[in-house]
Amino acid sequence: MKQILVTFNNSLEDEYALDFAAKLAKQSHSYLHVLTFGNDLQGVEAENLEYENAKKPNRTPHNTKTGITEDLISKIAFLDERLIQIESLPEFDYSEINRLIKKLEIDLVVAGLHKKTKINDHVFGSITEKLVRSVNCPIITVKEKFQNESVKTIVFASNFEEEIKLPFFGFLKLSGQLKAKTHLLYVNTPDNFKNTDYINQTMNWFSEDYQKNAFTLNTYDAHSVEEGVLAFAKEINADLIGIISHEKTRFTLMSSSLTEKLINISEIPILNVSIV
C-alpha cells in the first residue's frame, strides 16, 4: 500500500476519516491524497480552481497553504506534509473518482459515513454511500473518532469459500504492512448452522497457503453474522473489521446485505474489499 485516498466534504465524520487515513498513511509510510468536492474548494488559490476540463481532477500542491489546503494540513499535522496531496473535483461523480483512483494508482480509499444515514436507503445522498457501491478499490468507512495512534488488531470475517482466497492475499498484505495482528473469524448462526468439524476443516483448508503465525483462527456463535462479528471485534478490542463482498452484487457473501448491515451499525471502521 503506497497511495491512500480520503474523501473530504466538510462534515465531522469526514474529519474522523481524514484523521484515520492520515494515521494509516503514517503507519504504512504511504502518500495521502485528500479529495475535495465543489464548494469545499473556495479557499484554494484561484489558479488552482481552473480546470482544463470540467470533469478533469485538479491537483493542489501540498505546499499551497491557503484556504482549505492549509486547514486540511493543520488537521493532520502529525503526518509529514511532503506525503500530503490535495485533489479536487467540481462535483461528486463516481466514474471520475474511479478514473482518479486509476490515474493515481490508489491502493485504498477512506471515507466518513454520517451516523444518521443508512447505506441501504433508497436515496443515496452521501458521498460515502455512493463510493461503497461504486468504487473500484478497497474502501474503509469511518463513523467515529479513531482514538488510537495506529491499527494494531484486525478482524477478518468470512465464510472462507474458494472465491475469497485471491482477494485475501491483498488483505493479508495490507495487515502485514500495518504490522497488525489479524484474527480470522467464522460466525456460526442458527439459520446456517455448521458443526465444529466442518468449520475447522474449512478454516484449516483456507489458511493452509499462508504462514500460520500470520493470523489466528476463531469461531463465534451468534444469532446473526453481523452480531457475531461486532461482538467478537469488541471482545478483542479490534481497530478494524475486514470483509470481502462480490463485485456484481456488492453485498452478497456470507449473508444477504452483510456488509451494508455492518457499515450501518458498526462504530469500528469497516474495510470492504470487492471480488473482481
Regions found by a protein language model. Give the residues of each.
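Local beta-strand N-terminus motif with an aromatic residue
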Residues: 1, 105-107, 137, 151, ...
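Small/aliphatic-rich secondary-structure junction motif
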Residues: 1-53, 153-219, 238-240, 265
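Short secondary-structure boundary segments
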Residues: 36, 113, 186, 244-246, ...
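A short acidic, glycine-rich active-site loop
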Residues: 52-66
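Structural beta-alpha unit
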Residues: 74-109, 210-260, 264, 268
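Hydrophobic alpha-helical segments and helix pairs
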Residues: 96-144
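Charged helix-capping and loop-helix junction motifs
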Residues: 124-127, 198-202, 254-261
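Short, flexible loop segments at boundaries between secondary-structure elements
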Residues: 268-276
